[in-house]
């Protein structure tokens, strides 16, 4: 019995590592899809919603690890949107967005993990709540970063974010649909995170 449980534990850890690595790579890949707009030059990109996709699919722990791995790789390689490093982003107006990932992912992931076994319509609605709440956290922390690094007041920081809201809202709807599709195809993927 001990051999079987230890081998199943090792297999679970191995698959967790694989999921984390795959989602870190996905977040990195989606960072190269960027269009600069707005007052502060912060780009519209898929990376902001991709980290929340990691939370919705993997849950709070593995989603956080995937996001952390992405940011760790970014210390050494230019994997953030626009070909920037994590260190560069921390010294720029985007500091709030980068730090927000570490808050938004666990929040969205906890909600997703708790509702994954709900009926499909309820799950879809609550996944949307989780995704948009994570996005709201990114916007609030992003605005704070803009206030400190771009010398904007609260109104200016809020105005700088306006061009991003429509596209981010659409992106998040797509990410929620993808997450629900993944959980439909792989119904046990998130269950161990909800325990």
Residue ranges of predicted features:
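Short helix-perturbing small/polar motifs within transmembrane alpha-helices
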Residues: 3-7, 18-21, 29, 86-138
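Structural signal for the C-terminal ends of transmembrane alpha-helices
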Residues: 57-61, 107-116, 181-186
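Helix-loop junctions at the membrane-solvent interface of multi-pass transporters
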Residues: 33, 57, 76, 84, ...
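Hydrophobic transmembrane alpha-helices
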Residues: 2-64
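Alpha-helical transmembrane segments in multi-pass membrane proteins
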Residues: 22-30, 51, 55, 66-74, ...
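Interfacial aromatic-anchored transmembrane helix boundaries in multi-pass membrane proteins
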Residues: 31-43, 71-104
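Membrane-embedded alpha-helical hairpins and interfacial helices in multi-pass inner-membrane proteins
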Residues: 83-84, 117-194
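Residue-level signature of transmembrane alpha-helical entry/exit and packing/kink sites
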Residues: 12-23, 44, 48-51, 63, ...
